[in-house]
Amino acid sequence: MGRTIRRRRSNSSLSEAISVSLGINQDSSVNKMHRASVSAMSPPLCRSYMSGFFTGGNSPMINNLSDSKLPISNKQHPKVIHGSENLHRQTAQLSNEFCSSSVEENSPTIKDYMDIIGNGDRKDDQSMRTIEENIDEEYSDEYSRLLLSPASSNVDDDRNRGLQNSSLPELEDGYAGGYQSLRPSHNLRFRPRNLWHMCTSFPSKFAHYLPAAVLGLLLNILDALSYGMIIFPITEPVFSHLGPTGISMFYISTIISQAVYSGGWSSFPSGIGSEMIEITPFYHTMALAIKEALAGNDDEIITTTIFCYVISSMLTGVVFYALGKLRLGKIVGFFPRHILIGCIGGVGYFLIITGIEVTTRVAKFEYSWPFFSGLFTDYDTLAKWLLPVLLTVVLIGTQRYFKNSLVLPSFYILTLVLFHFIVAIIPTLSLDALRQAGWIFPIANSDSKWYDHYRLFNVHKVHWSLVLQQIPTMMALTFFGILHVPINVPALAMSLQMDKYDVDRELIAHGYSNFFSGLLGSVQNYLVYTNSVLFIRAGADSPFAGFLLIALTICIMIIGPVIISFIPICIVGSLIFLLGYELLVEALVDTWNKLNRFEYLTVVIIVFTMGIFDFVLGIIVGILIACFSFLVDSTKLQTINGEYNGNVARSTVYRDYVQTKFLDGIGEQIYVLKLQNLLFFGTIISIEEKIERLLQISNKDATKRRIKYLILDFKNINADNIDYSAAEGFNRIKRFTETKRIKLIISSIKERDRIYNAFNNVGLLNDVELFADLNSALEWCENEFLFQYKQLRKKAKERLEEGKQNNVVSAVIAATKNKKIDTIGNGLNRGSNGDTARNLMSLPTNTPRNYQILSVAQNVFVNDEQAVKNFKKEYKDDEPVLPILLFALKQYRPDIISEVQKVREKEIKFWAQLCPYFTRRRLASQSHLLHADNIFFLVETGMLKATYELPQGTLYEIFSNGTCFGKIIAPGNAMPREQKLTIETETDSVLWVIDSSSLNKLKEDNLALYVEVALMVMCIKDTRFKELLGYTLVSA
């Protein structure tokens, strides 16, 4: 099965693009092997009377554009998306300065570095480092399978050639009812091995398939009499003599389609092809329009009309063939089925009206009281339409009682015999008298032949201007015709238990049959579901049966015109009424409680619009209703796939204890909205309303969300396209967030995306941060908060130094006055005056967000960071790795900073035993750390990236300084090859490492410590696993 790899939001075929815009193809992170399949258990739509059925480093405090200024696009200097490598360097520098115990006066601040990074991101793309992207790849589904298809329409060329050059289909028992079904083998064309075999096998095959062929012939005859007869509007005087011509054109179309299907161009060599009944209303529309334009010129009317018929057939064939060759078989399946059902009901309504016109011989059905009263008060007229109605009622009742495919042909054969028997035994009745009274079709001319209609093809009498005027009707006819193949073909395959078929191949076959039918002066045709099922179940399991049916049909066609003069009009009327009844039941009765109210109302509107006004108008109304329905339904799409604050949605950066504590406290000021589905004028309103409700910030109401960074993630947007209204909607969202002093961030967007270009064109990207993925956006937001905390800490240190100087001056003055003072600074250094320490930090604006940041920063500074600095000073003369080790283990071993001295000293003494086993390493940027699955290390400075390569995809995390990580695999155990861990330095780094040999030595020297290290590694990995799993679930 020909699968093709495609990149997300890449250019694809037309049918795939539509599949994406409707949501059929989903993201590969959800399901790479997803195949859209639609059930085919509902009945086919066809005649059914036979069976009754980012810029970098900028702090968020940026001067906003005034509301009076219109946003303008910046095509010369487009907004640059933040690069992941620059972002990781920023995080590394921030962590290095963050963990230092003091800030030197002349040292560059982290903000200077962030500005450098930002300026670097603004440079031209050629000077930037290549942005490392993770592009989702997914298999494009081989085929949407439309209704039930288990096989792809996008099969490869070799398979196509295999299907085109196959042998006789194999026979396989069906699952129900003992029926036999067809399963195509290697060759579908009928090719006898040799002439001798053909000659000897012909008699036996003829006898074997003759009953099935006779049944198929009866079906063709009934179809010819029911709607072949009314190809032309025979109730109009100018067309009244063209009933036999319509039948001949019907037979020609049937023979050509049967030859194409049985000749090996179709997967159903025993299927029955026949004229499309749905074309009749369109033909009548064209014929009547031409008659009105050429009143009084009968020959020119007929010639122009018949040319319109054959041109429409050729046009239909070309469209069928093009759809099949372009592999667009599934595209027609996107048309709403209830619209098609309404069109089918419209055909049924038309047939009921036509049945009344044919039986009563009225020129045109009128919607007036005199006309309706005449149908009941004129006894002759009443009898002519009531009798076929009664025949139809009797037949419907008989079919419900007897479930046999022969009921229909047997009923009408018996009716025909009974009619002539009654005429024979009643002396006052005669065929001639009945013909004059309108009960039997008039006698055809004695020299009338089946090919007489070819005499009507006179190019000199064609009014080509009128032909051009009928092109809209021809297009509507073609559009309506192509909707049946993707419905009837899967339905027939299901009935025959076929597992392998190709809708595109069937479209090509229909293209041949319709084009050649028009070329030979006939009308449209298609594969008839009901007749094909009856034909195959009667024993037609070989193309031979199809060719035998062709021969019998040719015989009847040659005799044709003579037979018509002996057929009672009531039988033809009954057939028309039956077909109209079946289609109306299928449209209006069978869909009750299956369609919702809006869909059912749509069906009713289409039915009566087609029946009362015009078929083309009905299709236009149906398409408009379908578009309106799609618009209404699209506005109801759930555009928010998920919403998370920063406490839940965290980046995969592994940060030290102090940074983690601070981010835990202010995480709710980061808010993520994951968008999904389509972005257009119908869905942007719901997004605006959601954000407006979300950003209702109040100084008094603590229940309102305190959001500083709003991230809109575009990962699950189904189509890389957005209209102007939606782009302007995001501009309104941006202006609204600016009034609330909230930074708008967009993630999962790339510079090559059309959405990026649309946003740039409307000026949305000014003062908006852009990131290629959600992880980078979260990392940037966390860095901004950590920078703000560092600034607060720097101010606290400056105030602390000022306090110490003031205390010295106060001490000198007090000494001269013999007074004693208690310095505040000593109290602070001992951490005994927490309240004063808190007062060292402040923010200029007292808002709920700033108050929260200040409160959390004060708590972290007093309770955690001061404690960490104290033990760093206490153990600075010991092993240089010890303070780093204790700082890294603090979040996993709280006893390291326990207030109980004995507990703290015992814990520190225990872990101090590990220091001799560490080795200090300096690694340049982009260096690999070899671990052999046994390692424990501390990050003193720098930044590392750990990449996990799994069968399901690749995931990475960043290790900042002040953290520890390890991996220990017991001897004899091995990790699966497909689960690979790669550790690489993102910046120049300094590590303290216990490698595999040192771990083995530790195990021999101090088993208890080795076990604790192993348990520590397990604890670290468990914590990191939960963090990574959480991010994976959030970003899905």
UniProtKB/Swiss-Prot annotation:
Vacuolar topological domain residue ranges: 1-213, 258-269, 322-338, 397-405, 495-515, 568, 626-664
Modified residues annotated as Phosphothreonine in this record: 130, 847
Gene Ontology cellular-component terms listed: fungal-type vacuole; fungal-type vacuole membrane; plasma membrane
Subcellular localization, as worded in the UniProt entry: Vacuole membrane
Keyword entries, A-Z: Amino-acid transport, Membrane, Phosphoprotein, Transmembrane, Transmembrane helix, Transport, Vacuole
MF terms (GO), sorted A to Z: arginine binding
Function: Amino acid transporter involved in vacuolar uptake of basic amino acids for storage during nitrogen replete condititions. May function as an amino acid/proton antiporter.
Further remarks about this protein from its record: Present with 1420 molecules/cell in log phase SD medium.
Gene ablation phenotype (knockout): Decreases cellular arginine uptake. Sensitive to canavanine; the effect is suppressed by simultaneous knockout of YPQ2.
Protein name: Vacuolar basic amino acid transporter VSB1
Keyword DNA-binding part of the UniProt annotation: no
Parts of the chain on the Cytoplasmic side: 235-236, 291-300, 360-375, 427-473, 537-546, 590-604, 686-1036
Protein source organism: Saccharomyces cerevisiae (strain ATCC 204508 / S288c) (Baker's yeast)
Sequence positions bearing Phosphoserine: 42, 127, 140, 144, 149, 152-153, 842
